[in-house]
């Protein structure tokens, strides 16, 4: 699947190492390979954006290495491809040797996988399923400040799905563990690949059922009900959390305005 990049090769360039992304001038490189000193490098074609190829180059650059979060305000499709590149780069870096027999591995030529030529084991990129849920109580939405978000942003509740657990069970458990309340009338909304580091967010809306807010201090700094027209600082546009909040606000406006 990989190839040597030639002088006139063009497209979008995902240059990644250790979950970082090369962002000269704060943007994803776009254009001729020669303009970015990429001629002669090995590259994988990982997709297409606006009719042009998207290439992954496994390489560290001394300057301008940043987080994929810096391109979250790009078009959703391009952000997803950037996230794919960063996750694949980390997958290839962390799977150089077989976990069963210890022998060197090599990339598959037909799929995103690493193969062991000794014991024939096959490894795929790990994806961690997560739930994220907007909870409505009449004209209000439950928003919380997480311990890892010290910038004042309030968002909806989220968490990882545990082994042997359904998505619906994960929603009920995470909400109870983090806020102490029960929910009902769960409804699936959408999903979003989230490369921090390798999650797949499954988004839901739910209604408040019972209980008083009792936060888990290991997870949350605070949690409260906020009326739809009096909200605190929210996650940025482009995130599934922001979409859930905006969808909930739209439902409240339709009913209470």
Swiss-Prot record:
Residue positions binding a divalent metal cation 1: 158, 178, 219
Annotated EC: 3.6.1.-, 3.6.1.22
Keywords: Hydrolase, Magnesium, Manganese, Metal-binding, NAD, Zinc
GO biological process, one term: NADH metabolic process
Single Gene Ontology MF annotation: magnesium ion binding
Residues where a divalent metal cation 3 binds: 174, 178, 219
Residues that, per the record, bind a divalent metal cation 2: 174
Membrane-crossing segments per the record: none
PROSITE patterns: NUDIX, NUDIX_BOX
The family this protein is said to belong to: Belongs to the Nudix hydrolase family. NudC subfamily.
Quaternary structure (record): Homodimer.
Listed name of the protein: NAD-capped RNA hydrolase NudC
Source species: Salmonella heidelberg (strain SL476)
Source organism phylogeny: Bacteria, Pseudomonadati, Pseudomonadota, Gammaproteobacteria, Enterobacterales
Gene encoding the protein: nudC
């Amino acid at each position: 699947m990989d190839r040597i990049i030639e002088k006139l090769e063009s497209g979008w360039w995902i240059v990644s190492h250790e979950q970082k992304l090369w962002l000269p001038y704060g943007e994803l490189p776009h254009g001729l390979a020669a303009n970015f000193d990429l001629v002669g490098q090995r590259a994988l074609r990982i997709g297409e954006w606006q009719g042009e190829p998207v290439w992954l180059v496994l390489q560290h650059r001394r300057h301008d290495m940043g987080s994929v979060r810096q391109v979250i305000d790009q078009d959703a499709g391009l952000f997803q491809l950037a996230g794919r590149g960063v996750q694949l780069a980390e997958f290839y870096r962390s799977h150089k040797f077989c976990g069963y027999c210890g022998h060197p591995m090599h990339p598959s030529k037909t799929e995103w996988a690493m193969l062991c030529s000794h014991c024939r084991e096959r490894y795929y990129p790990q994806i961690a399923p997560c739930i994220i849920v907007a909870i409505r109580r009449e004209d209000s939405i439950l928003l919380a400040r997480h311990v890892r978000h010290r910038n004042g942003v309030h968002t909806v509740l989220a968490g990882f799905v545990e082994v042997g657990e359904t998505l619906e069970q994960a929603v009920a458990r995470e909400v109870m563990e983090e806020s102490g309340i029960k929910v009902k009338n769960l409804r699936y909304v959408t999903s979003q690949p989230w490369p921090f580091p390798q999650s797949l967010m499954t988004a839901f809306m739910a209604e408040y059922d019972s209980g008083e807010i009792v936060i888990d201090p290991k997870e949350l700094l605070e949690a409260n009900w906020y009326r739809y027209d009096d909200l605190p600082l929210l996650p940025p546009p482009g995130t599934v959390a922001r979409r859930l909040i905006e969808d909930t606000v739209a439902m409240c406006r339709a009913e209470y305005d």
